[in-house]
Structures are given as C-alpha cells and as structure tokens.
Amino acid sequence: MKALHFGAGNIGRGFIGKLLADAGAQLTFADVNQPLLDALNKRKRYQVNVVGEQARVEEVKNVSAVNSGSPEVVALIAEADIVTTAVGPQILARIAATVAQGLITRHQQGNTRPLNIIACENMVRGTSQLKQHVFAALSEDEQIWVEQHVGFVDSAVDRIVPPSEAGSTDILAVTVETFSEWIVDGTQFKGQPPEIVGMELTDNLMAFVERKLFTLNTGHAITAYLGQLAGHQTIRDAILDPAVRQTVKGAMEESGAVLIKRYAFDPQKHAAYINKILSRFENPYLHDDVERVGRQPLRKLSAGDRLIKPLLGTLEYQLPHDSLVTGIAAAMSYRSEQDPQAQELVTLLAQLGPKAALAQISGLPADSEVVEQAVSVYNAMQQKLAH
C-alpha cells in the first residue's frame, strides 16, 4: 500500500502517519517545513512517545518526505493507494490544486486502481470540503473520471498531541496520549477499504463527528478559555480547578443532551464518555498549554464549530445551555500576543462592542436572548479581571 500524508507535524507523525506505517504502508510525508523533511529523509524513522499510566516509546520506520510544493507530490498522488491529510482546516484549500494535478496525472497515466483520500482534520466533513476545492480545479471530463475512481472519505479523528517540549533536541520525536480514535465513513470508499489497525469504519459518521466535536473539542476549548481567565498554565491545572471543571463538565453534559436527542445515544454510555475525556484532560504526562489550545478563537466561535454548533442544538431542542454560554463568553475573553485571531478578536470587540462582535463572528442574531446572555457573562468576566 502506497500512502501519501500531507502534514508532517505532530498529528501527522504521532497519529495518522504512525497508523499508516504500522499497517505496513510505504509512507511519504508531504510538508513545507524543509528541516523536518531533511531529517525524515536522512533518518527514515522517528520516535513516538506514548504517555499515560504505562509510558512507552515506539519507532516508526521506512518513511520518506517530499516538499508539498514539488512535482514529486503530483507523481506520488498518481501512484498512491491512499492519501491522508493533517494540515489544519485553513490549509486544506491550499493543497487542493496539487491534489487535483495529481489526479489529472493519474488519469493521463491510465491508473484506474481505486484511490481513497481522507482528510483527518478537526472539522465536520473535511474531506467533502477538500473535494469541492479539488473539483473546482478539474474539467468536467476529469470530474467524471475522478468520481469513478477516487473515494473522498470523511473522518473523525481524536488524539491529543501537544507540541514538542521546549528544549527537545530531536526535531522528529513526538509525544502523544495513549487514547486514539480514527473513525471513517465506510460508505464513501472506492474499492475495498484498506486494513489499518486503529481506523474504524461506520455508516453513521455524523454521530461520531458531532460526539467528538461536542465533547472533546467543546470541553478542551472551554477548559483552555476558563483556565486562562483563572490564571492556569496548562489544561491539567485548569481541569483540576473545581470551578473550571464544573462549567466544563456542565457544557459537555449540555452538548451531550443534544447528541442523545439527535442520535439516540445511550445516556449512561455518553456520561462515561464525558468522564473518560475529563480524565484525558487530567493526564499528568501531557503538558498542554491553555494558550495553545485556545488559539484561533474566531474559528472556534464560528457557526459550525465546537461552541456555537452545540449551542444551536440546545436552542433547536429547547435544552439548557448556561455552561455553554459561559464557555462562549470565556472564548470572547481569550487573549494571546502570539495568535493573529486573538488580536483580530480584540479589534472587533473594541470596534463593534461585544454584542455586534459576537453576532458577526458566530452568525447568531444580535438581538437574540442567548447573545444577550453571553454578553452579560462576558461583561462580568471583564469587570472581574479589572479588579
């Protein structure tokens, strides 16, 4: 199995790339970070530190790397059996032209073996969005050929992979938690789905996508935002603060009530899933910084993301949402000198005021009760910070 993975960052190396390599794939990473590519090509291997109760070091072998802007990538797509990505939602559109060129070359070479493309991003149906960008760069004839021979497979991914420790001397080493979940839409494959241990097939992907988004992502973000407000440095410190924990757990229970209503989840099993996630946030071996987890607040406050989407579900089913609203107010309070979106958020709040700013970012009606509530909590948070 020939595999090409876009994104040689921590998630690429520590999660998706690792599962592909473990499955015996001939794996090539595509990235723009030249020192990283040089190190991968020189060593052909790297270490993954799996941390938890039983820490272990695993080695990923027989890997290579190419620059994602190079002609080699096009040639690899023309030959690959599987193409995966972990580049971040914003970058997906940027790699689409390269993917399209690879598919055109594949067509020209007469390669009719099935190819499956799986975007492994923190977004809802990311591969379907990638497909739209790719198809925009294809002629009608090429689109027809691609529809026949290429599967665009949506997925849900879950593994906490913090950045490398400061002072780490090995550019390739990566630290990951023990837990990992990669769920793919089994209905979207062309040909037989590849056998990859750790990749689960489902015919009801949206239930898993929203379960993860509404629980892990919602909880992680709110832990970060409330943690920063309370002066905590790491996710672990924040979630061990009883006040933060109460709101985070409350928000996950509120979003969970939406999932139970929408997908008929078992309430007891979902409660256990929430507790499992809280224990993952407490992992003493993961040093995950609240400022890192909170970054890109404009994206995280957008209509389809981890804060507003579950809130919209509570409004749809007339369910409680006080903790989610507190989380939204905390996201509005996020500040970071390192994050351009945090700077933009501050500008919007100053120019428009909190009410109009939240409405513009989230798509919620400015005069809605829920926006009034979020602004009221936000103002109280700002007053508290001022004293």
Curated annotation (Swiss-Prot):
GO biological process: mannitol catabolic process
Gene label: mtlD
PANTHER family: ALTRONATE OXIDOREDUCTASE-RELATED (PTHR30524:SF0), MANNITOL-1-PHOSPHATE 5-DEHYDROGENASE (PTHR30524)
Family the entry assigns: Belongs to the mannitol dehydrogenase family.
Keyword Oxidoreductase: yes
InterPro entries: 6-PGluconate_DH-like_C_sf (IPR008927), 6PGD_dom2 (IPR013328), Mannitol_1_phos_5_DH (IPR023028), Mannitol_DH (IPR000669), Mannitol_DH_C (IPR013118), Mannitol_DH_CS (IPR023027), Mannitol_DH_N (IPR013131), NAD(P)-bd_dom_sf (IPR036291)
GO cellular component, one term: cytosol
Pfam family, one: Mannitol_dh
Protein name per Swiss-Prot or TrEMBL: Mannitol-1-phosphate 5-dehydrogenase
Binding-site list for NAD(+): A3, L4, H5, F6, G7, A8, G9, N10, I11, G12, R13, G14
UniProt keywords, alphabetically: NAD, Oxidoreductase
NCBIfam families: PRK02318.1-2 (NF002646), PRK02318.1-3 (NF002647), PRK02318.2-2 (NF002650), PRK02318.2-5 (NF002652)
EC code: 1.1.1.17
GO molecular function list: mannitol-1-phosphate 5-dehydrogenase activity
Catalytic activity annotation: D-mannitol 1-phosphate + NAD(+) = beta-D-fructose 6-phosphate + NADH + H(+)
